[in-house]
Amino acid sequence: MYPSTGLQTALNKMREMSVDNGSIYHQYVPVVTESTTIGEFGQPIIDPQNVNVLNDFVGLLKKVVYTAVYSKTFNSPLADLEGDRMPLGNFIEDVYVNPAKARGFNVNDFAGLLQKYEAQIATQYLAVNSDLQYCVTITRDKIRNAFTSWSNLEAFITGIVNSLYNGAYITRYNQTKGLPLAAFKAGAIKYEVITNPTDEATAKALVRKMRADYTKMQVPSTAFNAWNDVKGAGSFALNTWSDPEDLIVMISSDVEALLDVDVLSVAFNIDRSKLLGKIYVVSDFSQYNEDGTVAVDGSMIKAVLCDKSFFKIKTQDFDMEDFRNPNNRTIQMYLNDTRMVNYSLFANAKVYTTAEPTPSGSDS
């Protein structure tokens, strides 16, 4: 059996990196071709007299694994709701300035020149609040077994990639789809109580409501952001609006299943070929424990219509480290994922729910 094209590419990329960084790996390990045997490739790596080659292999493998995990993670269905990276600091000061109010022109108003016109400025502080690590332990036995065949080596590398990627993907997916639920529970998002969509007719009725709000959100209004709801008495209302290309729909799969694709396409003026990226279908809006039990019930939420800016998500660190433990001859690989995962009180956003939140807090 010979190595697959993908495996050849990955292994030869590792060798190229060794040449670039001047390590000894490329001096012992050959270029992999269709006719290279696993013995020719693996023997220099697992040679007990040349442990530095194995160490180089692990270091180079870490880079290949990281590249694969990074590419897959940042191409996940909800990844484009994330903002720019946040390289420094732990907090972001997010500011919104209300539109200036007009005043009538008066040719005799000389005193107005010295009058102070205060801008209405709203500020929210968002913090880095998710610092997670995903770990994989590699034993000497696993390495030896990996070099018994090309298929075993490919399975070994794929297993590491999938373990780290799946862990990060699941957490990121749940964090993103959990933001509307978190805001709903906190009284920090507008909502409307609807009839539970159980058939095509009730599902279409929901879409009609959303279509009306989709149009209204494009006009300056104080009706679709939660700033005043959260800040309470004494605060000022924010006048906000959204460009149509910035409005997205997040809908539960049970409701989406009741609708024809054309219904969503027509309702939100989206070409069928461009529905992905504007309409996000999620399994549901609940949050779950590791054993599958419900941690936070979000089953009452059926859909969300919001500006993309509602999702205040930024990655600060996404990197890999490794540690060799000679005591038990294992190698630990760590994927570090540090992020800010918050929602905005400035953004137009609305939840469509079959029940009031606890506690209740909407004027919709």
Which residue ranges define each predicted feature?
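Assembly/oligomerization interface modules of large self-assembling protein complexes
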Residues: 51-136
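Extended, compositionally biased alpha-helical segments that mediate assembly or anchoring
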Residues: 1-67, 72, 265-364
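A structural signal for well-ordered alpha-helices, especially hydrophobic packing surfaces
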Residues: 61, 65, 111, 164, ...
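Residue-level signal for secondary-structure boundary elements
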Residues: 69, 165-172, 176, 215-226
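Long, contiguous amphipathic alpha-helices that act as assembly "spine/axial" helices in icosahedral shell
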Residues: 122-192, 332-335
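Short glycine-rich, low-complexity/disordered patches
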Residues: 26-30, 70-79, 173, 184-185, ...
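Extended helix-rich, non-globular scaffold segments
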Residues: 192-200
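Extended oligomerization regions of viral-like shell subunits
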Residues: 202-318
